[in-house]
Amino acid sequence: MKFQAVVFDMDGVITDTEKLYRRFQLEEGRRLGIPDDVMVVACERIAGGTKYTNKQRFEEVVGMGIDYYEFREAVVNKLDAHIQAHGVELKPGVADTLKYLKEKNAKVGLATSTVRERATGYLKAHQIDRYFDELVFGDTVEH
């Protein structure tokens, strides 16, 4: 099969960060007194969204007068600290797949809700940024 172009997502596809987001979301939810079963539903609703769409989704599920942006900032701070200490893992086979696609002259894109600085940092850390022809980030799309 000949591929002309392939577009990837970042979290949970290129990098193994989705599980880290979930871990830190649940931790922060517990700290705020949100039951785990409610947080699991909230996490499912906000996965892959932007901070703007996620505010409404989070507040619809959680309610309780909890400020989503403060919650998000605490989660992102925990995520950043973890990645600073331990790095971020690629999902298995990612580098080989990207190399294969480029060898076949396929265009490769990334479309992610992750912000530019974080996403490009992940790509550069694993030296896979060179495989991407087009990049779209959560903070570069107008709402």
Residue ranges and their predicted role:
Residues 3-95, 100, 104, 117:
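N-terminal helical cap/lid subdomain that shapes the substrate entry/recognition surface
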Residues 14, 109-110:
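Short catalytic-loop micro-motif centered on adjacent basic/acidic residues
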Residues 88-89, 109, 115-143:
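Substrate-recognition "cap/lid" segment bordering the active-site pocket of phosphatases
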